[in-house]
Amino acid sequence: MAKLTKELFISALKEMSLLEIKELLDGLKEEFGIDPNALAVASAGPSNAPEAEEKTEFTVVMKNFGKNRLPVIKVIREITGLGLLDADKFIKVPDQKVKENVSKALAEDIKAKLEQAGAVIELQ
């Protein structure tokens, strides 16, 4: 007797009518003592996983400074307090973290200022 693979079983199920599938489920219940309804309820039951919480702290990441770096340097100096040369070096590094662990409102404000200056920004 050839081994029944999952693919063959699924293919056979596709060709069955609803009545035949119900009879198959009844046969499984009788043969193995399995109640398909209990399995469905158990699998759809409440999860012990914690619900996703809304983020309260964000990191502002500058992907790149865009076409013109001078306006971005000015905004970076304003936000970080860096000097001119340090701000220039800062913006040349891709995926640079501008500010870490800041509130959503502050992160969005920083993002808006930098995007207005031409930078590409991502909030993480």
Curated annotation (Swiss-Prot):
- Cellular compartments per GO CC: cytosolic large ribosomal subunit
Q: Name the UniProt key words of this record, in alphabetical order.
A: Ribonucleoprotein, Ribosomal protein
User: Matching InterPro entries, A to Z?
Assistant: Ribosomal_bL12, Ribosomal_bL12_C, Ribosomal_bL12_C/ClpS-like, Ribosomal_bL12_oligo, Ribosomal_bL12_oligo_N_sf
Q: Name the Gene Ontology molecular function terms of this record.
A: mRNA binding; structural constituent of ribosome
Tell me if Protein transport is a UniProt keyword of this record: no
TM segments? none
Gene Ontology biological process terms from the UniProt entry: translation
Q: What does this protein do?
A: Forms part of the ribosomal stalk which helps the ribosome interact with GTP-bound translation factors. Is thus essential for accurate translation.
Note the NCBIfam families from the entry: L12
According to its UniProt record, which protein family does this protein belong to? Belongs to the bacterial ribosomal protein bL12 family.
- Assembly and interactions? Homodimer. Part of the ribosomal stalk of the 50S ribosomal subunit. Forms a multimeric L10(L12)X complex, where L10 forms an elongated spine to which 2 to 4 L12 dimers bind in a sequential fashion. Binds GTP-bound translation factors.
How is this protein named in the record? Large ribosomal subunit protein bL12
- Organism encoding this protein: Phytoplasma australiense
